[in-house]
Amino acid sequence: HPYGQGPSGSPGGTISKLTFDASGNVSASHLYAERLSFPTSIAPYKDGVIVAAGDLIFLRDTDGDHIADVRQTLLTGFNQGVTDSNLSGLRWGLDGRLHGVNGGNNGIIYSPQSAADPLALRNADFAWNPLTGRVSRTYHTGGGFGLIFDRFGRSFTPHNINHILQRILPVKAMERFRGFPSIKATSSISDHGGMARIYPISTAQTRVNHPEQAGYFSSSGGMGLIPGTFTHGSLVGGVLVCDVVGNLVHRDVMYPKGPILEARRAPEEQSHEFIASRDLAFRPVGLETGPDGHLYLMDMQRGVIEHPDYIPEQIMGNYRIREGADRGRIYRVASVDETSYENTNLASATHEELVAHLGHENDWVRGTAHRLIVERQATTNRSSFKEAIASGSITSKIHALWCMNGLGMTHIEDVQLGLNDQHPEVRVQSLKILEKHPEWWNQAWPVVQSMAQDPDAEVRFHIALILGCHPHPDNEAALI
C-alpha cells in the first residue's frame, strides 16, 4: 500500500501464519504467502485459506512447512481502484457461500476452472458457492471496505462517511422489476447521522482534502461484532466500526426499527469512543472474534493513511507515504466479565459434536462448526439436526436449518417447523430457505399466507419478498 512494491509497483502483499503457545501468546510467525496484490481479506477453507488479493485466490500448504505451495485462482476479473474500495470483506454466510463486497468497482468476473459465462457485477456485491463454483450478485454494494453478518444473518457494510449501512433488498428481488430504484437497497441505519459525530483523542482529526470532516466519520472501514462471550451490559449485540483517520473504533448498539435495524451510539459512550488512541499511526482496519472468545483488533500502523491520489501535489513532498509499513500490530481485547475458553479442536470433532457447537455463544466456534459440517458433506445423519431444530437455541435452530440445506438434506417438514417457530429470527431464515425450493411452494402456501399477518415486521417484510418470487392467485390478497 498504496502503489505496490518498488518503482515498478509490483505486488508486495504478504500473509503471515501465526502460531500460539499454551498461554495464548504468539510464539512464531511464518511467511505463508507473498507477492500478493493488495490483500484485503482472508477466510478459512478446507485445509487452506481464500484471500481477496485482486483476484479470489485459494492458498494451501501441502508439506507442513508453513508456506503455501498451492495458489489457485478461483475468481478473476474484479476491477481495481483505490485500495480501500477493492474486493474485500470475505465472510462465510449461513447459506454456505463465501460473500464479499465489490467496493463499487464493477468488473466482469469469471472462474478460470469453470465454463460458466462471466458475470458482470455492475454495482453489486457477490457470493461464491464452493460446491458448484457458481458466483452470484447479492446486494447493491455500499462501496466501502468490509462486511459483517450478525448471528441472525443480517449483513452490514461501511462506506467512508456512512459508517454503517444495512444490506436490505437483495439484487434478485430488485431485478424482477426493470427500472426499480436501487439507491436505498443498501442504506444507512445510523440514528446519529450519515456523517456521524466521532470523538478522537488524537491531534490529527481530518483528511488533507476534506477539512470539513474534522470530528466526523470520514474513513469508516473494517467492521466487527462484539463477541457473544462479552456479556456485560450493552456490550451484548454491539457492532464495531473503525475510522482510520480518527485513530479510533466506534461502537453502536442495534435496535429493531420496523423490518430493519437502527444503529445507536452505545449509551456508555455518548461523548467518547470504544477505543481511541493518541498515536497518530494507530490505524484500525479490522476486527475478528478468535477461537478463545476474545476480540482481535488489526492495526495497520501508518503515519499517512490518505491515499496519495487525494493529497495535493504541492504538499506531497512533506509526507513519508510508507512510514509504518514495518509496524503492523494485532491487539487482543478481553471483557472483564468474559468467560475464558479453551481452544476447541473442531478439525477432529465428530459430526454430532459439530452440530452441538451450532448453538455455542462464541461466534467463531459456531461459525466454524457450520463451515466444517458443510465442507465435509456428510449426509448420513439427520437426527442431530432435527433435534436442534425442535428444541435448540435460536442460533442452533438457524444453523441446523441452513446446514441441512447446504447438505441437500432439507425436507419441507423441517422448513415448516421453522416457519412455526416462536422466534421471529428462525421464521425469517426458514422463509429464505423456502424461497430456494419452489417445488415446495404450493404445499407451504397456507402457512406462508397466514404469516402475512405475523406480529414481527421483519417476518412480514420477507413474506412480501417471497410472495414476489412465487406467483400464486392469492398473493395479492395476502399482501393486502
Feature-to-residue mapping (PLM):
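Hydrophobic core positions within HEAT/HEAT-like alpha-solenoid repeats
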Residues: 355, 370, 386, 398-401, ...
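Conserved, compact domain cores that house catalytic/ligand-binding motifs in diverse enzymes
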Residues: 359-382
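Residue-level detector of extended alpha-helical repeat arrays and alpha-solenoid scaffolds
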Residues: 365-366, 397, 427, 460, ...
